[in-house]
Amino acid sequence: MSSAPCHTTVLREPAVDALLARAGPAPAGTWVDATFGRGGHTRLILCRLGPQGRLVAFDKDPEAIAEAMRITDARFSIRHQGFGQLGQLPAGSLAGVLMDLGVSSPQIDSPERGFSFRFDGPLDMRMDTTRGLSAADWLATADAGQIAQVLRDYGEERFAGLIAKAIVARRQARGPLARTAELADLVAGAVKTREPGQNPATRTFQALRIFINAELEELQQALAASLLVLQPGGRLVVLSFHSLEDRIVKQFIARHSRQPFDRRVPFAAPQAMQLLALARVRPDAAEVAANPRARSAIMRVAERTQAHGAERSDMRRAERPDARRAEHGEVLPP
């Protein structure tokens, strides 16, 4: 196994500043780092919290859990769970939630994890390597229609059909794909039109990673849960790194920061808005120059209001990852 690459946390100070903005000089209460990663945000939050503060972190990656276990601060605890399980925490118990979405540098730069077309390694792509199907497992059984749909839905790949047919043809002729280099070469051969400055396999790798890890569905679950677990005045801070993530976050905040209107009762709204949209922040030029991976980041900040609403029904409406994955042909355990 290769040594873990270095990870530079994007918008580290601005994100923690936004999270703790209303908390005073020695923040108490319970806070959540929903995506521990390598602990960049977690460590800064712990530096800022007062003695009565508590920080709970979530992560699916066993390597992230191992890193988190090195933190001996009694105010900190780690859960080996995806942040879609945020709703397991007590209602109204949290002073703030920080979500840093997507894949971390140690994950994408480790060939054995299979996230990148830049290195040859096993075609895995699972954030939690202890469970679930790898990308190779799924591609070994999915039909061309299922593969094409995933590439369209999660990669916005306009050559999805051609790539899917090439994957199935390769499987029938030579056996299933097992390595990242095999998939990258196959996509390069199938896609004749190049986007300037972008590897032709970029969208395919993104789509498979998002699908295998149910990333967008888990995000929807966590956002819905945030309405339930945040206390009034609690902050929601979300960092996204591509348009599919940011669209979900933007629409969620917009939907819950509008005053609902019931046509049947034109003189009164049935509930008040549940979120107050506060900010949209991009990394400055200095951060992008120091860390080019920050260039696509968008941070959105919202605050939970006093309003009560149908939080639990929102959580039920949030699309279940298993249901979405089943649509794309994955055989799920009972």
UniProtKB/Swiss-Prot annotation:
Disulfide bonds: none annotated. GO terms for biological process: rRNA base methylation. GO terms for cellular component: cytoplasm. Coiled coil: none annotated. It catalyses: cytidine(1402) in 16S rRNA + S-adenosyl-L-methionine = N(4)-methylcytidine(1402) in 16S rRNA + S-adenosyl-L-homocysteine + H(+). S-adenosyl-L-methionine binds at residues 39-41, 59, 83, 100, 107. InterPro entries: RsmH (IPR002903), SAM-dep_MeTrfase_MraW_recog (IPR023397), SAM-dependent_MTases_sf (IPR029063). GO terms for molecular function: rRNA (cytosine-N4-)-methyltransferase activity. Residues 303-334 are annotated as: Disordered. It is found in: Cytoplasm. Belongs to the methyltransferase superfamily. RsmH family. This is Ribosomal RNA small subunit methyltransferase H. The lineage of its organism: Bacteria, Pseudomonadati, Pseudomonadota, Betaproteobacteria, Burkholderiales.
